[in-house]
């Protein structure tokens, strides 16, 4: 199971390391959406973690709320 988690988390890590530093910061929440996804998958498993991350990404838009939103 840990290998499958690592495979799912790897693209998030690549984004955080290779792409995010060169993009304009646009996430309205703390932690960022990618950090939230990483933590949600580690804490809740792959299926629920991806579900929570997807819901979070859909909430992250210019007309939405902002602020501290930790993984529950």
UniProtKB/Swiss-Prot annotation:
Cellular localisation: Cell inner membrane
Pfam families per UniProt: YidD (PF01809)
Top-rank taxon: Bacteria
InterPro entries: Membr_insert_effic_factor_YidD
Annotated membrane topology: Peripheral membrane protein
Keyword Cell inner membrane included in the entry's annotation: yes
Chief location: membrane
Keywords: Cell inner membrane, Cell membrane, Membrane
One Gene Ontology CC term in the entry: plasma membrane
Membrane listed as a keyword: yes
Role summary: Could be involved in insertion of integral membrane proteins into the membrane.
NCBIfam families: membrane protein insertion efficiency factor YidD
UniProt record similarity statement: Belongs to the UPF0161 family.
Name of the protein: Putative membrane protein insertion efficiency factor
The species this protein was found in: Amoebophilus asiaticus (strain 5a2)
